[in-house]
Design a protein with these regions (language model features):
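Non-membrane alpha-helical segments in proteins
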Residues: 1-12, 46
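Alpha-helical protein-protein interaction modules
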Residues: 9, 17, 24-28, 40, ...
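A generic tandem-repeat structural signature
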Residues: 27, 35-52
Length: 203
């Protein structure tokens, strides 16, 4: 967890592969001591998802969920994996439950991340109206949310240039490497990934 935070906040000079290898090694050691440690399975699920190993991400997410089915962090992590692997209804059920149980996650000051997870889920469900509805509950946009919301607006034939997301895109993210950014969305379907990348690069 600490290694992941260091990487995403820019506090580590190690490259991504080194950090993930070290994180996995540490978690594996912890699992050797206690194979029923749900935190280890939860974190391994996240590590495998980041490496696009969706089978193992789902496997460890399920193990954590079976141990503590009402932990919001487990619900959120496992739900994120399921919506990506085609089990959208179940994934959304878990993401909505995480939001209901713990709308503002520990250590955070808003419900943005929970809502962004729901945006991801409803995007995969192709419920574009719900994606746009949720967009108004996000206070700080990130590249993933911008791409998913703008894509959803386009599917609803809305004027993109009038949206908050378009303005943030042009002011804060105009230099974004979208190939790299979309890869970090960890989308299993190559068709969906390509369509989204083509769309956002053309906006």
């Amino acid at each position: 967890c600490t290694l992941g935070q260091a990487m995403f906040r820019g506090f580590s000079d190690q490259n991504t592969e080194e950090i993930f290898a070290e994180a996995k090694e540490n978690i594996d050691k912890a699992l050797e001591l206690n194979e029923n440690d749900f935190e280890c399975h939860r974190m391994l699920s996240a590590v495998y998802l980041s490496n696009h190993d969706y089978v193992l991400a789902e496997d460890h997410g399920k193990k954590a969920f079976n141990m503590v089915p009402n932990d919001p962090r487990v619900l959120s992590g496992y739900g994120e994996v399921l919506v990506r692997t085609g089990k959208v209804d179940k994934g959304l059920e878990l993401l909505n439950k995480a939001y209901e149980l713990d709308p503002i996650p520990q250590g955070q000051s808003s419900s943005d991340n929970r809502v962004k997870d729901l945006v991801l889920g409803y995007f995969f469900a192709e419920d574009y109206n719900k994606v746009v509805e949720l967009s108004f509950d996000i206070s700080v946009m990130d590249p993933r949310s911008i791409a998913l919301i703008l894509y959803s607006r386009s599917q609803l034939k809305q004027d993109l240039e009038m949206s908050k997301e378009y303005k943030v895109l042009k002011s804060d993210y105009k230099e974004t490497d979208w190939t790299q950014a979309v890869d970090r969305f960890h989308i299993q379907s190559e068709d969906i990934r390509k369509n989204l990348l083509e769309f956002i690069e053309g906006v």
